């Protein structure tokens, strides 16, 4: 795992590949105030229950540009943000998840968390796997994002109590899924 703790700021330089497998596997993580990961031209692949491509929590932050994330497993989210004060800036990237409840971007009850998404694809294939899931009072801003779901009851945007702004094109199949649930 590519990880930042205790005010660390690891940065990828050049083409980088991060692969991990097993329950709770992580591709990249930032945890704690001042901890930040910077990913450019990076491929992340995780396999396993509760795996995450990028995991940011407890005031950590991540900058990701021109990356690809591919997760496989139940609740294996592409980008996971937890605890208030955390921040993720994602641009020019692609997220693909395969698994039940494996969301593209999940902001888990993190009041004050900020996620900025620009020119990015988030595609999910599992049942109950929303492209963007934010059940709490968080904020997500989109700029030309494409959100696609293919599983049963998988919303493009599931934003209960959250704020979502910007341009996003959600498409959902089958008919049991919806573009936006607020």
Please annotate each region the language model reported.
Residues 8-24, 36-50, 60-75, 87-101, ...:
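Beta-strand-rich solenoid/repeat architectures in extracellular/passenger domains
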């Amino acid at each position: 795992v590519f990880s930042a703790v205790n005010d660390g700021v690891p940065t990828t330089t050049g083409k980088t590949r991060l692969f991990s497998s097993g329950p709770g596997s992580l591709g990249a993580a930032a945890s704690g105030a001042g901890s930040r990961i910077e990913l450019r031209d990076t491929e992340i692949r995780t396999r396993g229950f509760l795996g995450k491509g990028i995991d940011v929590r407890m005031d950590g932050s991540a900058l990701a540009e021109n990356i690809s994330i591919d997760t496989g497993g139940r609740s294996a989210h592409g980008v996971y943000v937890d605890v208030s004060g955390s921040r993720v800036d994602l641009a020019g990237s692609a997220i693909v998840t395969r698994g039940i409840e494996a969301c593209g971007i999940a902001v888990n009850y993190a009041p004050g968390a900020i996620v900025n998404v620009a020119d990015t694809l988030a595609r999910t294939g599992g049942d109950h796997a929303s492209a963007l899931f934010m059940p709490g009072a968080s904020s997500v801003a989109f700029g030309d994002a494409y959100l696609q779901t293919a599983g049963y009851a998988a919303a493009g945007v599931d934003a209960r109590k959250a704020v979502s702004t910007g341009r996003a094109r959600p498409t959902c199949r089958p008919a049991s899924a919806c573009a936006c649930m607020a």
